[in-house]
Amino acid sequence: MPQKTKDTPMMRQYFAVKNQYPDAFLFYRLGDFYEMFFDDAIKGAQLLELTLTTRNHSAENPIPMCGVPHRAVQNYIDILVDKGYKVAICEQMEDPKLAKGMVKREVIQLVTPGTTLERGAEQAKTNNYLTALIQRDQQYGFAYADLSTGELKTSVLTTNDTLINELTSLQTKEIVVDDSVASDLRDQIKTLGILISEQNNVTPQAQLSYLTQDLTVDLEQQVVERLLMYITVTQKRSLAHLQKAIAYEPSYFLKLDHNSKYNLELMKSIRTGKKQGTLLWLLDETKTAMGGRLLKQWIDRPLIVKADIETRQNKVATLLDHYFERSNLQEELTKVYDLERLAGRVAFGSVNGRDLVQLKTSLRQIPKIRYILSELDTQVFNDEVNQLDPVEDVADLIDAAIVEDAPLSVTDGGVIKDGYNEQLDQYRDAMNNGKKWIAELEAQERATTGIKNLKIGFNRVFGYYIEVTKANLAQLPKDRYERKQTLTNAERFSTPELKSHESLILEAESHSTDLEYQLFTKVRETVKKAIQRLQTLAKAVAAIDVLQSFAVVSEDYHFVRPKLTKSHDLKIVDGRHPVVEKVMGNQSYVPNNVTMSPDETVLLITGPNMSGKSTYMRQLALTVIMAQIGCFVPAKSAQLPIFDQIFTRIGATDDLISGQSTFMVEMQEANNALQHATANSLVLFDEIGRGTATYDGMALAQAIIEFVHNHIHAKTLFSTHYHELTALDQELSGLRNVHVGATEQDGELVFLHKVEPGAADKSYGVHVAKLAGMPTSLLERANKILTSLENQTSTVSTTAASIAASDAANSVAPNTAASMPVEAADESQPVESETPVAEAPVAEAGDEQLSLFAEPAVTDAKGEKVLQQLKTLNLMAMTPMDVMNQLYKWQQKLGK
């Protein structure tokens, strides 16, 4: 930057401030505008669609600049913060009229993606979490806070996967770190679109020590202190609304990793990325912003303690049994504003008169809500009733002090009620009498001069004035009117009388405005003392709101109360996918049973594409989640065990960020389940193995099924197009075949969407292609190829069962990896074995060569070497991932 640019006092002040916030847009207050200069102006003008101009445009090096009006600044701040930027607000700390020399300016707040408080109506039901992370050896200290609600929690995480799951669950936009966080982890966090902020220095804050006094783990205390330090440095205001830090353990809840939440569409639709079409969309009949946020938290963290779940169920059942009371409750809840965020604004000093009126209105509904709940013929809501403190002292204070239709500004007057303060009433009388005198003077001057359009007005520059059009100037008496301003078509004057009363009126207005602000500040500080009571109240109202929402949805869609058992018995009669059912509306939804005895581990699901296999699997997972958050479930009846984790491998998606293929993503997600699932987990595997060669895929699918069946024992739904795997029920006692029915009518495929016992007899793939509109000639060719293949591969169906039987005969030891089919190593070369395997199809004379599918035999040296390695392979000691890796090495060696 040229030295001349820095020489002016204002520019020196600007750079002194800007150097403290190099990574933020600096909004520099100049009069009624916030200005940006240099690179901030160039980039800000582009992002905010502002006109870029220059300061000192005639100079050798004009300064790029742009600005926004101070009254509209919040909108522009929100735009930048939503785009992931920080904004430093540099305010004038003294009245420019009274300043001696350069006006003093300071940054009063650094607004960041994780600290912004002003959320629009569309985000009222969404938390905005600021997170913090420190790394010590193999452990992570993790904390998060929502500055708008005061929530503050912390945990010690032991794995990278758990950390990433927490970050994605919280949907955090900003994380505070120190030097301990490794660069590779930082890079991984950045790929999630999270802004990384540094806070390396932490100094003791005695005034905030109470927030960490209940923490017993050093790592948790350290990370919370770092988070609080960052908040203090950036926000520069009271944090009285922050609640004491609560330590939590992710394992205390049903674990759902990011992929499972995505695949099950809990919060966002896969297709649109929006709320509609999700479980949240279905269940959200909440009437308050607090209730909406709590509902998301419950869906994100289902319970695993039977007594806690049943407590929620009892409350939902009670509300279901009392329709009229529930309707009255809903009506009162609609009148309750966002108590949590109103309390946050009070603490931050950003609350206005309108906010306080909303707080009063909300508090006035609490006695009515208490009465409705106390009238229920049950004691299940006793805890909530006891927490419904109407905070009457605060409501009465606001009612006495603040006008009903309060303005947004608290510095321009008009906020305090008449009669609240005697001195204020006197000032207002002086103002009103003065204005009455002005009106009388205007009438008198018109009569004296004979000028009918003479008027008395006011502006902040010239004060009160008498305005006369130029056509009537000759009618004014001489020597009594003092000219103040000349306009195009008029002149403005003053008189000695007007001047004397003007000073009295303006003095009264000034004193009145100043006193009003002082009174408002006292009211705000009194309300501030009740923040903890307001937060306790908000939590109770939020819980009541979510429970009534469950009751409404359960009644509207005929949900039933699930019976929770400690056994592994799972029985759902006429279960439904709740979201699909809602989307279908009046169309008939085909319900299905899901039954698995304690000894049954795997349901192997076959059936054509588009028949509903994936929907059936998701349906079970959503039913489990709904049950464990305390809601009723979509079924005629339901008996469920309590699950500790849900794993899903549904859909085909490349990981573009990591550059990984669909198959690699599939294997990693499957491996995650195999490594971490327990006998109390629910596992959903959809079409495992479809991303690789046929025999490779089938080999892996069978090995995974056997591994889950023999060693994990988790309840598993496994859908597949490998019909050969259906023979596994002959050897795996805990596996049962089911299929989704379909039939042909007049050559057309009709999906029955009904899950029936046994394996599917056909996959109907060509029929589905026909439904997709593929060319007739292509479909005819596909049918011809299909017939030939079915004739040639009739022996394959016995392979899976015979391999499983062979393994059983060889007494596979518990806790060792399941065996692999030998054809996985060399798809076309028969290998001597005690177990019969599928032979490579050989075309008979006269048959048409199916060159698209036929695979050449391996007879070269590389193939022989692979064959020898296969013969010596210790299959009994290999995991499915070991097998996958070995197959990959062989494929590379064979040039595939």
From Swiss-Prot:
GO molecular function: ATP binding; ATP-dependent DNA damage sensor activity; damaged DNA binding; mismatched DNA binding
Protein name, entry field: DNA mismatch repair protein MutS
Family: Belongs to the DNA mismatch repair MutS family.
Organism superkingdom: Bacteria
Its job: This protein is involved in the repair of mismatches in DNA. It is possible that it carries out the mismatch recognition step. This protein has a weak ATPase activity.
GO CC field: cytosol
Gene Ontology BP terms: mismatch repair
Region (Disordered): 809-835
Entries under Pfam families matching the protein: MutS_I (PF01624), MutS_II (PF05188), MutS_III (PF05192), MutS_IV (PF05190), MutS_V (PF00488)
Keyword DNA repair: yes
Organism in which the protein naturally occurs: Lactiplantibacillus plantarum (strain ATCC BAA-793 / NCIMB 8826 / WCFS1)
UniProt entry keywords in alphabetical sequence: ATP-binding, DNA damage, DNA repair, DNA-binding, Nucleotide-binding
Record InterPro entries: DNA_mismatch_repair_MutS (IPR005748), DNA_mismatch_repair_MutS-lik_N (IPR007695), DNA_mismatch_repair_MutS/MSH (IPR017261), DNA_mismatch_repair_MutS_C (IPR000432), DNA_mismatch_repair_MutS_clamp (IPR007861), DNA_mismatch_repair_MutS_core (IPR007696), DNA_mismatch_repair_MutS_N (IPR016151), DNA_mismatch_repair_MutS_sf (IPR036187)
Annotated binding of ATP, by residue: 607-614
